[in-house]
Amino acid sequence: MATKFPSFSQGLAQDPTTRRIWYGIATAHDFESHDGMTEERLYQKLFSTHFGHLAIIGLWVSGNLFHIAWQGNFEQWVADPLHVRPIAHAIWDPHFGQGAIDAFTQAGASSPVNIAYSGLYHWFYTIGMKTNAELYQGSIFMMILSAWALFAGWLHLQPKFRPSLAWFKNAESRLNHHLAVLFGFSSIAWTGHLVHVAIPEARGQHVGWDNFLNVLPHPAGLGPFFTGNWGVYAENPDSLNQVFGSSEGAGTAILTFLGGFHPQTEALWLTDIAHHHLAIGCIFVIAGHMYRTNFGIGHSIKEILETHNPPKGTPGDLGAGHKGLYDTINNSLHFQLGLALASLGVVTSLVAQHMYSMPSYAFIAKDYTTQAALYTHHQYIAIALMCGAFAHGAIFFIRDYDPEANKDNVLARMLEHKEAIISHLSWVSLFLGFHTLGLYVHNDVVVAFGTPEKQILVEPVFAQFVQAASGKAMYGMDVLLSNASSSASLAAQNIPGEHYWLDAINGNTDVFLPIGPGDFLVHHAIALGLHTTTLILVKGALDARGSKLMPDKKDFGYSFPCDGPGRGGTCDISAWDAFYLAVFWALNTVGWLTFYWHWKHLAIWSGNVAQFNESSTYLMGWFRDYLWLNSSQLINGYNPFGSNNLAVWAWMFLFGHLVWATGFMFLISWRGYWQELIETIVWAHQRSPIANMMGYRDKPVALSIVQARVVGLAHFTVGYVLTYAAFLIASTSGKFG
């Protein structure tokens, strides 16, 4: 007898309605809730999924390498990276006639192709790849790695090779492995690749499988390393007129601290990058050995936390400090996942900021569309990770938190202070919202009445002070690094080696861009969005176990619609609802953030910074001079007279709006509407001559309120992303290629 889906839940499998299908999909990855699940089995399943995840990443990398080698123009691009557009892949079946075929036959190709805005060409080139053959080799290597990861995932599900629960709960050994081996050694290994392959290639010396054993990365060899004379490796760096990829102007240094950028590539010096990875690797190898594993030396994290008690009798007694935290964190996968997601979210946002302001890949700074795409991509990923962090924090409080084990410690005291925390966030959000919007609207009104001189324009003097302290001279503040005789400047001059940082910060680069009143306003708009998103997420987590309105909330789980009639006000207050609302605010915030970044850069790249500076101080300026003005080219990607190479983005722009608007159908009309509609459709089917031949194995029932919301949210999010992605890429590539 065939068992119905889902096999992991007999309760759901026996449900006679379509709820079986939807709840089955919704809980497929909630391993904790599956029938017969033990804690050990849960850890083993999750451990194996990590290998599956690695395999997917490997296949994705392999596919990119393969398609660029097969259908791209990598070798032509390497010969002239500033003028050749990189090709992502061919278009097999171009629609819409000869005009479209002609429009997409671009970048020197003989048939229709897509342009790459991923930055992969720049990355491959920077790390020492120059031929299609090398790309193919990389692709095959990643494919083998993926197959190995899939095998490892399967293997660790077999009875003989399943790790025990004690192995998973050994936090010190896991930290040792992750910090020292995965993070530390891989950073040092990457330094090795940069020193042995990438830096020689950047100086015109090819290093391959045929000669890597007899090409010395440094003329002095390992002598200076063993004699402690490490400074030799920083001597004779590349000169300012070095031609990347050739020996012209090349030095011999491999580990430097030059600062600033290579003048030709406008990217960080490869020798600086190698030095950075070596330092990071050494730090992490040391960090990984701080904790006590099998050898009885080093710290016990539990002992540190148990001992870490605040002094008694201080103003505002701090209770039991960190007592109980070790077991709480070590026994809760949701707590650990929340910490990991929050950390990764912050790092991803930092990656977005650093990729444009201090680019590490050769010539990527001049590929404007790629810069815009990568910044936006990483900020969107960051908000998704951060929302996930708070979601799992809330699930921790519902499923894993033990009030007895955490009595009076920092976690318990945070819950006790939740009213103060939530009300402060509320106050900050209200303050930022009213003041920022008030300034924008005031400026809108006076501009509309023809008196722009009456705008309230605030110079961001504190931010300008930070820029000046870091060496930006244009503000005339003469502080720290922007004052040649200050203690900071004198100390910097005494550090051996070249110093190109001041040239970078005062040159035509993206480090510390000049800022004014428009930046001040949008900075506070973004701050409003961040604080409101945080308010909703923090409130959702802190109230997840219960509130004055619903003290027994934890008994209802993470997501519930309401507690039925007779208990008014219990709708929309589950921890899941907080996550749901926060995602809208997160999208709102990342929208403002990416609008700001993109418009400011469009103005810089086109040599018309006045447009941003003058129009960004009132809302109509944003709507008219950023959104409307930059969508005109995009909307004309195709029209009655034909199409150009923006046609695909024009279509995606429309399609994104459609998906986004569909979200509202689910967000506004609730369960009763859908139930009535479904019953009407079932009635019509049963009375139609052909449709009545189809029977219903499950009785059709409408989505629950929570499900309708998640479907609406998914459409809203996907539509929002598709719409802005199309706008961003088309408006940038339409101007700059």
UniProtKB/Swiss-Prot annotation:
Pfam families: PsaA_PsaB. The keyword Transport applies. It catalyses: reduced [plastocyanin] + hnu + oxidized [2Fe-2S]-[ferredoxin] = oxidized [plastocyanin] + reduced [2Fe-2S]-[ferredoxin]. Phylloquinone binds at residue 674. It is a multi-pass membrane protein. GO terms for molecular function: 4 iron, 4 sulfur cluster binding; chlorophyll binding; electron transfer activity; magnesium ion binding; oxidoreductase activity. [4Fe-4S] cluster binds at residues 562, 571. GO terms for cellular component: photosystem I; plasma membrane-derived thylakoid membrane. It comes from the Bacteria. Its EC number is 1.97.1.12. Belongs to the PsaA/PsaB family. PsaA and PsaB bind P700, the primary electron donor of photosystem I (PSI), as well as the electron acceptors A0, A1 and FX. PSI is a plastocyanin/cytochrome c6-ferredoxin oxidoreductase, converting photonic excitation into a charge separation, which transfers an electron from the donor P700 chlorophyll pair to the spectroscopically characterized acceptors A0, A1, FX, FA and FB in turn. Oxidized P700 is reduced on the lumenal side of the thylakoid membrane by plastocyanin or cytochrome c6. This is Photosystem I P700 chlorophyll a apoprotein A2.
